[in-house]
Curated annotation (Swiss-Prot):
Domain spans labelled S4 RNA-binding: 111-175
Gene name of the record: rps4
Keyword field contains Isomerase: no
Organism: Methanosarcina barkeri (strain Fusaro / DSM 804)
SUPFAM superfamilies linked to this entry: Alpha-L RNA-binding motif
Gene Ontology CC annotations of this record: small ribosomal subunit
HAMAP family linked: Ribosomal_uS4_A (MF_01306_A)
Keywords in alphabetical order: Ribonucleoprotein, Ribosomal protein, RNA-binding, rRNA-binding
Biased composition (Basic and acidic residues): 198-208
Listed transmembrane segments: none
Protein name: Small ribosomal subunit protein uS4
Function, in words: One of the primary rRNA binding proteins, it binds directly to 16S rRNA where it nucleates assembly of the body of the 30S subunit. With S5 and S12 plays an important role in translational accuracy.
Length: 216
């Protein structure tokens, strides 16, 4: 138990710290979502792990009860978990408990305030979105929001905008983006997929090795 008033660690670190594939994936997520460090990736992964663990437990209970499925308290728990994930836009409204197992870390990162500010066209880049939030330029329902990592519900998403006293309220402000790219407005494409596509497009073609001329 943590001491009162002392912040306890809200995430789990990787069990094997030197896995090359996992480390490369974490670096991609940090760059794509403009994260401060890998800890923010681990927080999202821990949140996802919690929901997946609950889903596995409920599915195991349903399998043990054979044809009856989930009943009573377990059925209520299943409905509450699904309702919360649907409310935050992490899964679709017609999803069931099985769909939780197919979620990835980027599904959690997509619902961060920082990501939503970029997708709504309130910032030019994901890094600028983080800067606008931490500097107090962004508000939800008129209330200033300064935490880039807070998860945004679908309802609150419609009320994200510039804070009333922010200079960015003026449409002539030079740092205010004119329009949002269509690929960013499409919520079905994750920022990670956008970053990977951009990287593949900018990657120069591999040149074949220079052939050595044989002696005559």
């Amino acid at each position: 138990m943590a001491y009162p008033g002392k912040k306890s660690k809200s995430f789990e670190t990787p069990r094997h710290p030197w896995q090359e594939a996992r480390m490369a994936s974490e670096v991609q997520l940090v760059k794509a979502y403009g994260l401060r460090n890998k800890r923010e990736v681990w927080k999202a992964a821990s949140t996802l792990r919690m929901y997946r663990s609950e889903a596995r437990r409920l599915l195991a209970s349903a399998a043990n009860s054979q044809e009856r499925g989930l009943e009573g308290h377990q059925k209520t728990q299943s409905e509450e978990i699904l309702a919360k994930l649907i409310r935050y836009g992490i899964i679709k409204s017609d999803a069931d408990i099985d769909d939780i197992l197919s979620l990835k870390t980027e599904n959690i990162l997509e619902r961060r305030l920082q990501t939503q500010v970029l997708r709504l066209g309130l910032a030019r880049t994901v890094v600028q979105a983080r800067q606008f939030i931490t500097h107090g330029h962004i508000a939800i329902n008129g209330r200033k929001a300064t935490v880039p990592g807070m998860l945004v519900s679908k309802e609150d998403e419609m009320h994200i905008g510039y804070y009333a006293t922010s200079p960015l309220v003026s449409e002539s402000h030079p740092e205010r983006p004119v329009q949002v790219a269509s690929v960013l407005a499409d919520s079905t494409t994750t920022l990670r997929a956008v970053a990977e596509a951009k990287q593949a497009k900018e990657k120069p073609p591999e040149r074949g090795g220079r052939k050595r001329r044989g002696r005559r």
